[in-house]
Swiss-Prot record:
Organism listed in the record: Staphylococcus epidermidis (strain ATCC 35984 / DSM 28319 / BCRC 17069 / CCUG 31568 / BM 3577 / RP62A)
Catalytic activity as recorded in UniProt: NADP(+) + 2 CoA = CoA-disulfide + NADPH + H(+)
Keywords, comma-separated and alphabetical: FAD, Flavoprotein, NADP, Oxidoreductase, Redox-active center
InterPro entries, alphabetized: CoA_disulphide_reductase, CoA_disulphide_reductase_staph, FAD-bd_OxRdtase, FAD/NAD-bd_sf, FAD/NAD-binding_dom, FAD/NAD-linked_Rdtase_dimer_sf, Pyr_nucl-diS_OxRdtase_dimer
HAMAP family, alphabetized: CoA_diS_reduct
Catalytic residue list: 43
Binding sites annotated in the UniProt record for NADP(+): 151-166
Name under which the protein is recorded: Coenzyme A disulfide reductase
Length: 438
């Protein structure tokens, strides 16, 4: 019987445990989670802050007791793995409730410790990050108890944008700052203009090339010299992998602290696997490394690891496409493929179309901007981006499937659209991209 230890019990770890149990009813599975909660919906957290999702039970899928009762998997929360001895095949675990440590042996070790939010040096009682359910509940309680009215959001990634929208939805007066003009970095910068338009339409204050200098109580001094008072600060300034404890082992980390894995999600040590935000792998459609800390990859990794451990060695990870999407007020911004800063590795062309999301004569139409990048020689698709109030998600998902199948830009003329006036055009934007490229 295989004894499996899993480090981390959120998207990657909990899903991996479930998938293993689905295929293997006999092995002992123990999951260690350093925080309070397991199996919660990370992506729901900003909407919980905004009271868009009001019921905590909709965010939390399982408690440890429920997980054990349904799947016979032991989950120990407030238990942090602080050391790995891969030669003896043991982990050292710190019980945060008793402050005692103990060793646990394993046959197979699966690492899904995730990432932690970077922090500013504010040393402030009004400054928070949004990384887990505890963070979110703390922010929610703080806003309610202090009757917070003015909020400062720092950073311009997905979390910051979603929290900004949800704090505004909750009725707070929000100010947004970022240290540069490069926002929402997975999107082409000129296609981010709707973000600014939505901000200005709602009279939300924003400043780029701005940072916090220091915080004194509620008084925030900025690098520009401005001084303002806030009731709440949300820091969304990136993340770093929770891999410090792995340095005690022979598991290889790259220079940024991520774990390189192979097509089976194995580390350099065959009986140690890794998945989720802590890993780096490769793109599916181009020959480049890829670090994609998004939910799909964690779930795919969980399935592949489970298949491998059950003896199905024919299923492998074929790589990321980096498909991503964010809602910001009335707009959807989505992209797939390599990142904008990776285009420099290719000799490419770009084609774009700006057209209504569906037939112009049908009520409720709105503009949709679609852009596709392809290699000049092979004409293979390498990146696509879409922005609009309607239809951006559909087009990007179609192009994701096209990339998955190594389609060329010319193949897009053959895409057969599901056409009716409320949904599309007889000649869809994706078709037009193909025709324009010819």
């Amino acid at each position: 019987m295989n004894k499996i230890i899993i480090v981390g019990a959120v998207a990657g770890g909990a899903t991996c445990a479930s998938q293993i149990r689905r295929l293997d009813k006999e092995s002992e599975i123990i999951v260690f989670e350093k925080d309070r909660d397991m199996s919660f919906a990370n992506c729901a957290l900003p909407y919980y802050i905004g009271n868009v999702i009001e019921d905590r039970r909709k965010v939390l899928a399982y408690t440890p007791n429920q997980f054990y009762d349904k799947k016979q998997i032991t989950v120990k929360t407030y238990h942090e793995v602080i050391q790995i001895n891969d030669e003896r095949q043991t982990v050292t675990v710190l019980n945060h409730q008793t402050n005692q440590t103990f060793e646990e042996s394993y046959d197979t070790l699966i690492l899904s410790p995730g990432a932690s939010a970077n922090r500013l040096n504010t040393h402030s009682d009004i400054s928070f990050t949004v990384r887990n359910l505890e963070d979110t509940e703390t922010i929610d309680t703080f806003i309610t108890n202090t009757k917070a009215q003015r909020a400062l959001v720092v950073g311009a990634g997905y979390i910051s944008l979603e929290v900004l929208e949800n704090l505004h939805h909750r009725g707070l007066d929000v100010t947004w700052i970022h240290r540069s003009t490069n926002i929402n970095k997975l999107m082409d910068q000129d296609m981010n203009q709707p973000i600014i338009d939505e901000i200005e339409k709602r009279n939300i204050t924003y400043r780029f090339n701005e940072e916090i200098s220091h915080v004194n109580g509620h008084e925030v001094t900025f690098t520009s010299g401005k001084v303002e008072n806030f009731d709440l600060i949300i820091e969304g300034v990136g993340t770093h992998p929770n891999s410090q404890f792995i340095k005690s082992s022979n598991v290889i980390l790259n220079d940024k602290g991520y774990i390189p894995v192979n097509h089976n999600f194995q580390t350099n040590i065959p009986n140690i696997y890794a998945l989720g935000d802590v890993i780096t792998s490769h793109y599916r459609h181009v020959n480049l490394p890829a670090q994609v800390p998004l939910a799909w990859g964690a779930h795919r990794g969980a399935s592949i690891i489970a298949e491998q451990l059950s003896g199905n060695s024919s299923i492998h990870f074929k790589g990321y496409l980096g498909n991503n999407i964010v809602k910001f007020f009335d707009y959807t911004l989505a992209s797939v493929g390599i990142k904008p800063n990776e285009l420099k590795n290719f000799d490419y062309d770009m084609v774009e179309v700006k057209q209504g999301a569906h037939a112009g004569y049908y009520p409720g139409n709105s503009p949709l901007h679609l852009r596709v990048y392809f290699e000049k020689d092979s004409r293979k698709l390498i990146r696509a981006a879409a922005v609009g109030k309607q239809g951006a998600d559909k087009r990007i998902d179609v192009l994701s499937m096209a990339m998955m199948n190594n389609a060329t830009v010319d193949d897009l003329t053959e895409f057969e659209v599901a056409y009716a006036p409320p949904y599309s055009h007889p000649k869809d934007l994706i078709n037009l991209i193909g025709y324009k490229a010819q």
